[in-house]
Amino acid sequence: MAFQYQLMAQQLRQKIQAGEITAGQRLPSLRQFAEQQNISLNTAKSCYEMLEAQGLIYVKAKSGYFVQRPSAFSNCAIDAPKHPDFKSEMREVSTLALQIEIHEAAINSKLIHLGSIQLSSNLVPAKALSRSIQRALKYSKPEDFLYSDRQGHIRLREALSAHWAEDGFHISPELIYISNGCMPTLAVMIQSLTSEGDGVIVPTPNYNGQLQMLALLNRKIVEIPANTEGFDMVRLEHAMQESGAKVCLLTANFQNPLGFCLSNAEKEKIAQLAAKYQCYVIEDDIYAECSFSAQRPLPIQYWDQQGYVVYCGSVSKSLSPSYRVGWFCLPTRLKPMHAKIILRNVSVNTPLQLGLADFIFSREYRQHLTALRPKLQQQVQQYREFIAQAFQGVDFRLNHPQGNYALWLQFPDQINSLALYYFAAEQGINLVPGILFGEDSRYNNCIRLNAGHELSEEIQQAIQLLADWVRAELNNQAVA
């Protein structure tokens, strides 16, 4: 059953697409819209956020919401899987060998990297980071050069707690554990909360790195369908209740690869379902800081009242991919597992922790994010516009993220993304074929591209090569 804000968004979308509300027209303010429709302010906000995520409207600072020009939201929607026989049942990840092959190709520095989701070095505040590390070392104490607390240095835990509090998200430093990046964190929690052969509930399509990690840990998956508006909440509840899986691995804010951001109502619902069915949610919130708006969205953990949500994150997507520093927040309910988890969580380099703590406390991180967010938004829009131009005449769909910098392209069913991947590799181009993001070759007509680098002439030429291949493939099949 749809939420009220989804029904309101559908009605507004129909009016925009029918021309009843024209491009450039200003919409009622959130308060006015709530009063007109006799709905709560939160429902109105969720409605506008959904339309913004779909590229139908945009917000101007201190001016309000406006209808986007049509060219900006054409080809923006990705359908949910069109498989009537698609069942959310426990199964093994079948693409492990291919996952490993493509992962190794992604670190080849000689390739044009359109695949791996990472920031350009031009967006990394290298000088400011160096200053923070130098300050941290200058004012460090003798004990900072000994083995550190396995939970992580208290200075960094306090810095993260204070940083999140500014965004209305409060977690005690005592509940924060520092790790060597987000993926090791997820692996630690999967190993701690499940056993080999157990199932883990994941949306589909889902980040291929997570699927690879689950396969290597000999965990099965229970897939629930997702699209650019989020995932099927009814199927999620059914999976929690019936599948036998007692852990979900979810990203609520700017999911990779689709880029959706769940509404606050949906996040609260997930926290409630987790408690109702005693199904732990491991929340990967690695992209929250990459929001295109000034305010980062709240995580599912914000609504967790019973201790069934484990909050995880890292700075690798918002600061630097080389800073392999992550964290997880252990709810009080799981404190008895402290020793078991600490044993699996390898200690993190102490000077690096102190440097990052200085970077946060000095507000350099906040300033970096303030500059980064509009830059990412601009880059993503430039990529979308160039892709629309390059693939002109091709029946394709393209997501419209409001955070994150992953672009998900869906082509006609005749396109084999694995064949496109091998063609691109021969041309010195790296991309990620959609087949890696789910089972049953469900996304073999999709690819994921990275918009974290400036749209250079070299990248434009690479995208044009991909478009030419797709167009030629469709023409050849049409003739045949």
Across the structure, where does each feature detected by a protein language model lie?
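N-terminal basic, amphipathic alpha-helical segments
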Residues: 1-134, 314, 342-348, 382, ...
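Conserved glycine-rich beta-strand-loop-beta hairpin in the small C-terminal domain of fold type I
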Residues: 374-384, 396-410
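Conserved core segment of the aminotransferase class I/II
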Residues: 129, 305-374
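Short Gly/Ser/Thr- and Asp/Glu-enriched loop/turn motifs at secondary-structure junctions
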Residues: 60-62, 173, 400-404
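Conserved core of the PLP fold type I
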Residues: 140-277, 282, 288-290, 295-303, ...
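N-terminal small-domain helix-loop-helix segment of the aminotransferase-like
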Residues: 88-180, 188, 361, 430, ...
